A protein has these predicted regions:
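Conserved N-terminal structural segment that caps and organizes enzyme catalytic cores in eukaryotes
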Residues: 1-133, 138-210
Length: 210
């Protein structure tokens, strides 16, 4: 069976209750973000809303000198990355620091760090050229620097395997909440223990309809 992207999106969304589908709304999700690139401008460390994936394209002719260097940390290392951030930021650390998009990390420093158990953080580098796409994985942390003048467009995506991946990020943040005494407040990492994410709970049970 061959499906268009619109049909596939419709089928996948229909697997989620309307109450939960209504949560997955926002700029970059139902409509793309558009960014102006300048040489040396940076995009800070972040994970996508709801731990979604993200498709990013540079809007420029193939022969132009519009490039971007990306760095990424896979979701299975996010706990170690937070350990690194707690050591580096000290009292300035917050559990939501990756969602606030205010931090730009030296990738060499992150890659060279080792945890108390001797664990390392995997840091990957990607060079994106004009008209090329970069797709980020669910819950990955990414940042980078623009190397030319142009435009970049980005839109989030999620396929059926997103739910399990986002649940894993949620469990990591539960550990962080316990270790730090802080509570997450941004929507990038959903609290799947909340009733509003419970697929077996009706809208009336959480105080209204959507």
């Amino acid at each position: 069976k061959v499906m268009s992207s619109k049909t596939r999106e419709s089928d996948e969304q229909s697997n989620l209750p309307q109450r939960i589908r209504s949560l997955l709304w926002g700029a970059g999700i139902i409509s793309p973000w558009l960014y102006l690139m300048n040489p040396g401008s940076v995009f800070c460390c972040h994970i996508e809303d709801y731990a979604f994936g993200s498709a990013n394209v540079i809007i420029a002719p193939p022969g132009s000198h519009t490039w971007a260097a990306w760095y990424s940390v896979p979701r299975h290392d996010i706990g170690y990355l937070h350990e690194y951030l707690r050591e580096m930021l000290g009292d300035e650390y917050t559990i939501d620091c990756l969602e606030q998009r205010k931090i730009w990390l030296d990738p060499a420093s992150v890659s060279a760090w080792t945890s108390k158990e001797g664990k390392r953080i995997h840091v990957y580098r990607h060079l994106q050229g004009p008209s090329e796409y970069i797709a980020t994985d669910y819950g990955s942390v990414h940042w980078g620097v623009n190397l030319g003048i142009g435009w970049k467009a980005a839109v989030n995506f999620a396929f059926p395997d997103w739910w399990e991946a986002a649940q894993g990020i949620h469990l990591e943040y539960k550990k962080l909440e316990k270790a730090t005494g802080q509570k997450r407040s941004y929507r990038s990492v959903p609290d799947f223990d909340s009733k509003k994410w419970d697929t077996t709970t009706s809208a009336d049970e959480i105080g209204g309809t959507c």
